[in-house]
C-alpha cells in the first residue's frame, strides 16, 4: 500500500532560477500525498547547507565538479558532457538505493536542460517528465527552431505579433552564446518520449501558447511555483523560498524600511542572480532611479560598476542599495509601486502574481520575449526603449518608463491588469483550478506506476 504513494525524484539544473521552482513543485506534490526527493549537485548542497529535517528529502548527485561547480569547468560544453556522465551514474545509484525501501522511486522529474535523465528513468521503467522552467510561449518558439534545424522564419504564423527584437536573444543577436542556444534546443531531443511535459506557468496566462504546444506534446502547466502563503494558502507550511544560494543574514532591515514608505511609492530594482550590466548601463540606470524613491539590489560582483561616489550620495531615508533582498516579501509590500526587472521568468511570474506592474529591461535569452508579453499581451508594464546601435537604455527612457508605470495615463490600466493576473493565478491553484487539476493528473500517473 505504501508503494502506491509514489515517489518523485526531482532533478533541477543547478542554478537558483531552476532549483527554486523545482523545490516549490516538490512542496505541491508532497501536499498531494507523494513522497519527493530533490537532487542537488554536491557543490550546490555544500553551498546551501540545507535543512534536512523537512518533509522533502534531499539527495546529492554529481555534475563532475563537486568542489567548484560550473565555474570550474573549462566550457559549458565540457560541463554538460561531464554532468551527463556523472549525473547519469549518481542518479542511477539513488534509484537503486531506494529499490528495496518502502518507497521506491517511481518517477523522475528532470530539468529540460538535462534531457539525458529520461534515458536513466526508462532504464529503470520509471515515469519520466521534463520540467521547463521558462514559459510556454518561449518554449514553443524554441521548439519551432528545433524542428527547423536551429532557424526561425518570421513572421511566426501562430504568433504573428512577434518581431525580431521580441524573440529570445539567440535569434535577435545571431551567433550569440552558441553553447547556450544549443542547450535550449536540445531540450526537445527526446521530449516526445516523456509521459508529460511540465511547464512553470498557468493555463489562463498562456492559453493560446499552451494550446499550440499541446499539439506537439502532453503539456501540463503546474505554476505559478510561488509559496502557497502568498496565493491559495492551502499549504500552511509553505511560507517562502528556503533554498537560497544568495542570501542576507538579516531580512528585517529591508522590510522594516519599506514599512515606513508611502504606499506605491518605491521603485524596486533587481536584475536576478545572473544578469550582468555594462558600466555604461549601470551609470544610466543609477542616474534614472536617483529621481525616485528606490530599493535597488546590486550583487557584490556588480557593485564596482556603480558610478564613483553613487553609494555615498544615496539618501538612506528615501532609498536603499542592498546586495540581496527577500524578493517575495519585497514585492508583497504595499510600498512597492513598480518592479524594474530584467524579465527573468521567475521574477516576471512573481510580479504578475503579486500584482506589481513592471518596467522591463530584458538582457538576454528568454527575457526579450517575456518583456514583449509583459507590455503587449498581458499589458502589465512597459519595455524601456534602447539605443539601436549600442543597445543601451538611456536614463531619460528609463525615467520616462518608470513614470509611465507609476503615474502615467496607462498606470491604472496596468495595475488593473496585474490584479487580474494575480486573481487568475490564485484561482488556478485553488481546488479544481487549472494548475491544481494538472497536478492531480500528474500525481495519478505517478501513483499508478
Curated annotation (Swiss-Prot):
Expressed in seedlings. It is an enzyme of class 2 (transferase). Its EC number is 2.4.1.-. Signal peptide: none annotated. One of its GO terms (biological process) is positive regulation of seed germination. UDP-alpha-D-glucose binds at residues 273, 325-327, 342-350, 364-367. It holds the Pfam family UDPGT. GO terms for cellular component: cytosol. Induction: By auxin, abscisic acid, salicylic acid and the bacterial pathogen P.syringae. GO terms for molecular function: benzoic acid glucosyltransferase activity; nicotinate-O-glucosyltransferase activity; salicylic acid glucosyltransferase (ester-forming) activity; salicylic acid glucosyltransferase (glucoside-forming) activity; UDP-glucose:4-aminobenzoate acylglucosyltransferase activity; UDP-glucosyltransferase activity. InterPro entries: UDP_glucos_trans, UDP_glycos_trans_CS. Keywords: Glycosyltransferase, Transferase. Belongs to the UDP-glycosyltransferase family. Plants overexpressing UGT74F2 show increased susceptibility to the bacterial pathogen P.syringae and reduced accumulation of free SA upon infection. Glycosyltransferase that glucosylates benzoic acid and derivatives. Substrate preference is benzoic acid > salicylic acid (SA) > 3-hydroxybenzoic acid > 4-hydroxybenzoic acid. Catalyzes the formation of both SA 2-O-beta-D-glucoside (SAG) and SA glucose ester (SGE). Has high affinity for the tryptophan precursor anthranilate. Catalyzes the formation of anthranilate glucose ester. Is the major source of this activity in the plant. This is UDP-glycosyltransferase 74F2. It comes from Arabidopsis thaliana (Mouse-ear cress). The lineage of its organism: Eukaryota, Viridiplantae, Streptophyta, Embryophyta, Tracheophyta. The gene is UGT74F2.
Amino acid at each position: 500500500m505504501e508503494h502506491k504513494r509514489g515517489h518523485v525524484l526531482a532533478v533541477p539544473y543547478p542554478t537558483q532560477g531552476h532549483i527554486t521552482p523545482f523545490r516549490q513543485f516538490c512542496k505541491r506534490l508532497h501536499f498531494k500525498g507523494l513522497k519527493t526527493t530533490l537532487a542537488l549537485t554536491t557543490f550546490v548542497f555544500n553551498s546551501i547547507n540545507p535543512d534536512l529535517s523537512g518533509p522533502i528529502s534531499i539527495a546529492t548527485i554529481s555534475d563532475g565538479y563537486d568542489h567548484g561547480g560550473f565555474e570550474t569547468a573549462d566550457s559549458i560544453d565540457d560541463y554538460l558532457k561531464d554532468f551527463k556522465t556523472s549525473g547519469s551514474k549518481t542518479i542511477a545509484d539513488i534509484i537503486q538505493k531506494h529499490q528495496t525501501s518502502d518507497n521506491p522511486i517511481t518517477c523522475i522529474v528532470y530539468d529540460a536542460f538535462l534531457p539525458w535523465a529520461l534515458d536513466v528513468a526508462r532504464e529503470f521503467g520509471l515515469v519520466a517528465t521534463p520540467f521547463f522552467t521558462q514559459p510556454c510561449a518561449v518554449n514553443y518558439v524554441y521548439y519551432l527552431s528545433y524542428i527547423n534545424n536551429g532557424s526561425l522564419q518570421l513572421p511566426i504564423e501562430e504568433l504573428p505579433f512577434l518581431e525580431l527584437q521580441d524573440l529570445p536573444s539567440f535569434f535577435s543577436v545571431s551567433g550569440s552564446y552558441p553553447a547556450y542556444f544549443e542547450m535550449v534546443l536540445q531540450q526537445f531531443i527526446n521530449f516526445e518520449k516523456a509521459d508529460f511535459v511540465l511547464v512553470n506557468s498557468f493555463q489562463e496566462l498562456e492559453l493560446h501558447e499552451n494550446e499550440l504546444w499541446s499539439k506537439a506534446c502532453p503539456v501540463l502547466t503546474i505554476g505559478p511555483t510561488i509559496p502557497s502563503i502568498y496565493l491559495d494558502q492551502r499549504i500552511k507550511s509553505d511560507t517562502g523560498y528556503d533554498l537560497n544560494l544568495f542570501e542576507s543574514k538579516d531580512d528585517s532591515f529591508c522590510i522594516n524600511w519599506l514599512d515606513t514608505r508611502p504606499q506605491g511609492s518605491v521603485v524596486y530594482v533587481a536584475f536576478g542572480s545572473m544578469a550582468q550590466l555594462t558600466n555604461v548601463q549601470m551609470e544610466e540606470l543609477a542616474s534614472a532611479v536617483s529621481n525616485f524613491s528606490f530599493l535597488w539590489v546590486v550583487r557584490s560582483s556588480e557593485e564596482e560598476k556603480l558610478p564613483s561616489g553613487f553609494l555615498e550620495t544615496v539618501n538612506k531615508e528615501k532609498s536603499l542599495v542592498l546586495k540581496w533582498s527577500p524578493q517575495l516579501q519585497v514585492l508583497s509590500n504595499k510600498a512597492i509601486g513598480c518592479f524594474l526587472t530584467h524579465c527573468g521568468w521567475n521574477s516576471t511570474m512573481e510580479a504578475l502574481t503579486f500584482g506589481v506592474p513592471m518596467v522591463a529591461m530584458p538582457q538576454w535569452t528568454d527575457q526579450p520575449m517575456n518583456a514583449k508579453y509583459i507590455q503587449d499581451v498581458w499589458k502589465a508594464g512597459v519595455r524601456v526603449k534602447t539605443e539601436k546601435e549600442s543597445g543601451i537604455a538611456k536614463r531619460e527612457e528609463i525615467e520616462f518608463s518608470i513614470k509611465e508605470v507609476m503615474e502615467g495615463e496607462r498606470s491604472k490600466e496596468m495595475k488593473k491588469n496585474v490584479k487580474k493576473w494575480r486573481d487568475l493565478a490564485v484561482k488556478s491553484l485553488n481546488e479544481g483550478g487549472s494548475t491544481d487539476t494538472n497536478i492531480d493528473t500528474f500525481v495519478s500517473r505517478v501513483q499508478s506506476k
